[in-house]
């Protein structure tokens, strides 16, 4: 809505600590430490992994919590299932979507959540 605000930051101290953090971020190469092909987690690790992520938002005098959990390794097993279900949802459930650039949540919303819960081993909760 009109009053929606989003902010993401990494808070650091001033002076040398802040300068060091800024220099670190500006020189990072996020793909530089990526594993080479075949160096990722084992099949057993991918299939037996899981995750539970908690999001918290302060709104007026209350805190709203939402969580997402998955039944496989988030980097391999769950991601591939999310991409696949997003593609199927886009083709089957969102045929009338007007043109433009959307995030999966904005374009498919509840339809995608239902698919992910039904077919991809994900669980979404809001407290």
Name these PLM-found stretches.
Residues 1-127:
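C-terminal catalytic/substrate-binding lobe primarily of soluble NAD(P)-dependent oxidoreductases
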């Amino acid at each position: 809505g009109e009053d929606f605000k989003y902010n993401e930051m990494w808070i650091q101290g001033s002076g040398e600590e802040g300068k060091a953090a800024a220099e670190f971020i500006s020189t990072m190469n996020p793909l530089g430490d990526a594993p080479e092909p075949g160096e990722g987690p084992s099949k057993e690790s991918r299939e037996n992994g899981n995750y539970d992520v908690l999001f918290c938002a302060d709104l007026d005098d209350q805190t709203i919590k939402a969580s997402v959990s998955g039944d496989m390794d988030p980097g391999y097993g769950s991601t591939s299932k999310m991409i696949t279900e997003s593609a199927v949802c886009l083709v089957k459930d969102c045929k009338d979507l007007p043109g433009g650039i959307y995030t999966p949540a904005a374009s498919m919303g509840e339809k995608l959540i239902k698919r992910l819960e039904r077919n991809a081993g994900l669980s979404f909760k809001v407290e």
